[in-house]
């Protein structure tokens, strides 16, 4: 084998490797997984989720106060590596939601969202995943969510499931962020340091240039 043949073989291998990586799907929930939107959470007097109250707070005035969670480090790393990264969310996505994603460099290859469906979270995500994965060449890989019932749905499609709260907590500890009020039954939502998020974002943006 001469040098030119070796170079061509290396290019072919790299192309094949890139294509294999791109076929692998990594899915992220948004709320309480990548984004802390707890200040907009609404409940009825009985403690059940108030969807109408949530919708009323889905304006830019409120959404701009949302905060990125530590799992964004992983999001940017997966994007940089070339995986297909999607959002699977129970939100009814509107312009303020998309604006927040754009302004925080959360660029998904696809966003599977509620639309006008009134289904429960896990039922909605089951249908959206079924439709998305029915297209040839898509391989389920990782699925991040804060709810066990959604993780169970993802397992049916072959995803390795990741509990968002635990990964956010691990990232906090790994990056030496302050950890407070943790016990076996109460894992709080933690926010990463701005400078750490900035470093991850810069690495991702540099690759795009």
At which residue positions do the language-model features occur?
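Donor nucleotide-activated moiety binding/catalytic core segment of transferases
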Residues: 119-135
